[in-house]
């Protein structure tokens, strides 16, 4: 004779049905599984920083060298690096604005028929923020130029920005480079990935990582590749990738400045027989801008179109510059580094 069936036996036979809401068979009774809090997130990044201490110190040293170089160099070097970095970031972000089109937009507000004006405006904003002005520490909404259209809107931007800023303040003990990496990867989670997308996150991180630098107002992240900005993995792997990519970008920036300084010295010597203000102003424009058109040079130097074209032809004939865009109204020249 079989034993009587109890209510417990009935429930045991229903093993294939899901448990009650919130039930987790891997969690011991009495313990609820929770999302990691701010303290847990910060602890992960602190452990990641400790694991990358040697590489972090090495990269910080390279940043210090770039900062010193830019402090001693002409103002135009910072502007040039900001243009190059912004153009590289645009390709990573999907806007795909080339350096020549960006130069025309920043200098003359000119865009092609097929170009996205909103994308150009985003990348132009990146140039301005990378090149100077108050950093994100002065207030994220002001830095981004984003404000709530309706102050009483649900989930206002100012509230989301404040949450992100609070987490950054909580990570004040982290090195600025680590803290910038954390901020970049928490950007979307804070609900900040709106109209500016990854461009705003990367520019904010680039300025934050520079800390109190006087020469290097931003840390290059995308020059020579955007490995530093790739998502995926735990904080330890993200920070490792961040440092590797940042070191490569810093080396690219330093090599570029080496080549630019050598070109400037060579151009001064070759152009010494020329008289007037235009040759020197044109040489300076080619230092400040990676690509220059005749209308740009006319505006930057204040010289006549004829004087600009004559000097450009003279410099091209002596191998100082070369044309990079072919025929057309906006032919572009760059220094032969």
Task: Walk through the language-model features, giving the residues of each.
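FIC/Doc superfamily catalytic core
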Residues: 1-337
């Amino acid at each position: 004779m079989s034993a009587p069936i109890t209510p417990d036996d009935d429930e045991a036979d229903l093993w294939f049905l899901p448990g009650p809401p919130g039930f987790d068979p891997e969690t011991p009774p009495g313990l609820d599984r929770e999302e990691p809090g701010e303290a847990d997130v910060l602890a992960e990044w602190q452990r990641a920083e400790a694991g990358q201490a040697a590489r972090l110190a090495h990269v910080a040293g390279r940043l210090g060298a770039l900062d010193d170089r830019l402090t001693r160099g002409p103002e135009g070097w910072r502007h040039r690096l900001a243009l190059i970095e912004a153009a590289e970031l645009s390709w990573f972000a999907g806007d795909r604005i080339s350096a020549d089109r960006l130069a025309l937009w920043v200098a003359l507000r000119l865009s092609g028929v097929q170009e996205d004006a909103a994308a150009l405006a985003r990348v132009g904003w990146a140039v301005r923020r990378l090149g100077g002005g108050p950093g994100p520490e002065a207030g994220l909404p002001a830095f981004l130029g984003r404000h709530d259209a309706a102050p009483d809107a649900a989930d206002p931007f100012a509230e989301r920005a404040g949450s992100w800023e609070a987490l950054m303040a909580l990570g004040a003990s982290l090195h600025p480079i680590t803290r910038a990496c954390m901020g970049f990867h928490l950007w979307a989670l804070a609900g900040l990935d709106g109209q500016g997308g990854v461009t705003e996150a990367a520019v904010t991180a680039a300025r934050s990582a520079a800390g109190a630098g006087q020469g290097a107002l931003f840390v290059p992240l995308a020059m020579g590749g955007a490995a530093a900005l790739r998502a995926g993995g735990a904080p330890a792997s993200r920070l490792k990738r961040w440092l590797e990519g940042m070191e490569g970008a810093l080396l690219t920036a330093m090599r570029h400045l080496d080549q630019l300084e050598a070109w400037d010295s060579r151009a001064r010597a070759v152009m010494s027989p020329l008289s007037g203000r235009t040759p020197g102003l044109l040489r300076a424009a080619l230092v400040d801008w990676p690509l220059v058109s005749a209308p740009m040079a006319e505006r930057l130097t204040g010289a006549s179109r004829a004087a600009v074209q004559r000097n450009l032809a003279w410099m091209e004939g002596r191998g100082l510059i070369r044309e990079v865009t072919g025929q057309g109204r906006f032919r572009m020249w760059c220094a032969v580094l």
